Amino acid sequence: MSKEKVILAYSGGLDTSVAITWLKKDYDVIAVCMDVGEGKDLEFIHDKALTVGAVESYVLDVKDEFAEDYVLPALQAHAYYEQKYPLVSALSRPIIAKKLVEIAHKTGATTIAHGCTGKGNDQVRFEVAIAALDPSLKVVAPVREWKWSREEEIEYAKANGVPVPADLDNPYSVDQNLWGRANECGVLENPWNQAPEEAFGITNSPESAPDEAEYVDVTFKEGKPVALNGKEMKLADLIQEMNVIAGKHGVGRIDHVENRLVGIKSREIYECPGAIALLTAHKEIEDLTLVREVSHFKPILENELSNLIYNALWFSPATEAIIAYIKETQKVVNGIAKVKLYKGHAQVVARQSANSLYDENLATYTSADSFDQDAAIGFIKLWGLPTQVNSQVNHPFDK
């Protein structure tokens, strides 16, 4: 009797390698690894999955799709969870879940497995996404079921011939993609401990960053960054290039105690050099091109979208509707932002746009001023009329 097939989200690490051995007793395991911009050795991971016991192994480079369909909407929405975290890991989980479901359909698998623990956000993100895409698929979470200590897991691995990585004594848990790098555990679990330099991987410290500022011109077309210093490139490549440039200058270090979806607080160290530089540049072009009412209303939806994405609801009608609104606002977001990178800071120091609503003749205080100041008298009277009437009725001046 043939076994059911299970699709395993495979990283090549100890947890998911042990999961193959554990799952293959009851399933034919099909391992799937995706590169969302962390620079994995896909060939090595492909072969390792087969060596450990998978019957098939898929490796997928999804950087371009991730950048265009997931990162770009978040960039255009200035998506920060709790006004601080640019949703690094939260953005990659929906595309990973989507690809797992696609391969399940392709191979006839009935079940999807992931390597998340029972106290993190990612278990929720994967399982809610899978249920949204195909509720008939079953989900198993070996690591959550084991509840093993690290020592017990290593003992099981050795007993079953699973290679134990040489860097297993690394105290940190790291997740990385195009949009940044997330780090937790070890000394970071005490929020009073300053994060040591060894906890950072893609940014220089501001103290060791170059003593000379660097300027980067970011070109936007309909809200999408399309060129750095005039050189056009694919979005995924542009983000990676900005990661290198801004990371060199110490941009994008974030130390955050956040409220997890599962109800606990967690101290996280994020490095998002490209994200912070591009988010900063994009906001400045919006400030130049969007009318006041859109500029004031859009942040309300941005905050709601950030919460939806963080809280595992990418495949929600609410998320789809907000992204559609955001996309509509981007038609006029064209131009160039000049970003100054220096000692941990990304600052826009100049900007221009063919869609600019900034009129120098209206704004100037020189003799070139074309603003009709006499019109201000009637405007002020009408603008303040409701407040004036309320005061006269409810708070008459007491002589």
Curated annotation (Swiss-Prot):
GO terms for cellular component: cytoplasm. InterPro entries: Arginosuc_syn_C, Arginosuc_syn_N, Arginosuc_synth, Arginosuc_synth_CS, Arginosuc_synth_type_1_subfam, AS_cat/multimer_dom_body, Rossmann-like_a/b/a_fold. It is found in: Cytoplasm. The keyword Membrane does not apply. Belongs to the argininosuccinate synthase family. Type 1 subfamily. NCBIfam families: argG (TIGR00032), PRK00509.1 (NF001770). This is Argininosuccinate synthase. It comes from Streptococcus thermophilus (strain ATCC BAA-250 / LMG 18311).
